[in-house]
């Protein structure tokens, strides 16, 4: 189904760029929000309008949803920067968008959160996301909550470790999940734009353990398989130490990563891109 007027917030991020490409390929009329005009090339002015605004500054968003049918927001941060907190971005910036959407009579708001965010509200990064999810569900607008597994781009950390010739894991490394490529996730979101008031939990086509991912990373760099398993108590101690002695800016992303890596996070499978191929492509870049 073609959606004629879509506002895309977060268009310059990993997922946002894939979404922009898919939306235009499907001949949607897209308004992309950017902080700087040169952040996105506009190869097709027939389908894309670029508007400069900052989602954390509501005065720059005034009437930005006028004439829009659907808002898609991928707005969120993993690491706090520029003096902005998770609450400033993941919650309040999306609330700013939601307020404009309601004012302009937008019919559908799509928000990209993360897998098991509702289960891990105690984590600072999820606290902000889930607070917005709650607000969106009670806003009166039709909504879609997308809960993807980890992105392929997040798996680069395994490649960085593999460059040294060894990957370090906490615990057994048998925890499983199915990361997803940005293009696959973008396609899934666009395919489901006609479905309202639902939550979509989604992952890539391959369910892999942390050991599997470590082996793929090492193999892609032609390294021997060397994986060191650290006691899980060290993971828990690391989280406690960081929460006790550092700011949320420091411990937030590490707490998020170490918590989710300690359990299975398996979502319904989708897509055609495989992590093995992605690692090979990225490894070729690292070798140059």
List the predicted regions and their residue ranges.
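N-terminal Rossmann NAD(P)H-binding glycine-rich loop of SDR-like oxidoreductase domains
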Residues: 3-26
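NAD(P)H-binding glycine-rich loop region in Rossmannoid oxidoreductase-like domains
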Residues: 7, 38-96, 100-103, 116-118
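Non-catalytic, hydrophobic alpha-helical segments
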Residues: 15, 71, 185, 189, ...
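Glycine-/Pro-rich loop/turn segments that contact NAD(P) or position catalytic residues
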Residues: 77-163
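Glycine/proline-rich active-site loop of Rossmann-fold NAD(P)-dependent oxidoreductases
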Residues: 153-160, 191-200, 223-225
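Substrate-positioning beta->alpha
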Residues: 171-192, 198
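Substrate-binding strand-loop-helix patch
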Residues: 176-183, 202-220, 233-237, 273
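A hydrophobic C-terminal alpha-helical subdomain
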Residues: 232-288
């Amino acid at each position: 189904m073609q959606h004629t007027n879509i506002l895309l917030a977060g268009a310059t991020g990993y997922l946002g760029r894939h979404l922009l490409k898919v939306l235009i390929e499907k001949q949607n009329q897209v308004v992309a929000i950017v902080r700087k005009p040169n952040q996105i090339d506009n190869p097709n002015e027939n389908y894309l309008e670029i508007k400069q605004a900052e989602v954390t500054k509501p005065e720059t968003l005034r009437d930005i949803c006028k004439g829009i049918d659907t808002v898609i927001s991928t707005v969120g941060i993993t690491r706090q920067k520029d003096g902005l907190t998770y609450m400033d971005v993941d919650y309040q910036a999306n609330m700013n968008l939601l307020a404009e959407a309601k004012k302009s009579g937008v019919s559908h708001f799509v928000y990209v959160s993360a897998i098991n965010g509702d289960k891990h509200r105690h984590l600072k990064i999820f606290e902000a996301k889930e607070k917005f999810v709650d607000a969106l569900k009670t806003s009166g607008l039709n909504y879609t909550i997308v809960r993807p597994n980890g992105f392929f781009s997040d798996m680069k950390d395994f490649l960085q470790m593999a460059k040294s010739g060894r990957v370090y894991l906490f615990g057994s490394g048998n925890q499983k999940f199915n990361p997803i490529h940005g293009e696959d996730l973008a396609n899934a979101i666009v395919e489901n734009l006609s479905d309202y008031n639902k939550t979509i939990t989604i992952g890539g086509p391959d369910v892999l353990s942390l050991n599997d991912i470590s082996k793929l990373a090492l193999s892609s760099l032609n390294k021997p398989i060397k994986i060191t398993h650290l006691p899980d108590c060290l993971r828990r101690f690391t989280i406690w130490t960081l929460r006790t002695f550092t700011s949320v800016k420091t411990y937030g992303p590490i707490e998020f990563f170490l918590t989710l890596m300690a359990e299975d996070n398996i979502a319904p499978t989708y897509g055609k891109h495989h992590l093995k191929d992605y690692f090979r492509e990225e490894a070729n870049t690292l070798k140059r």
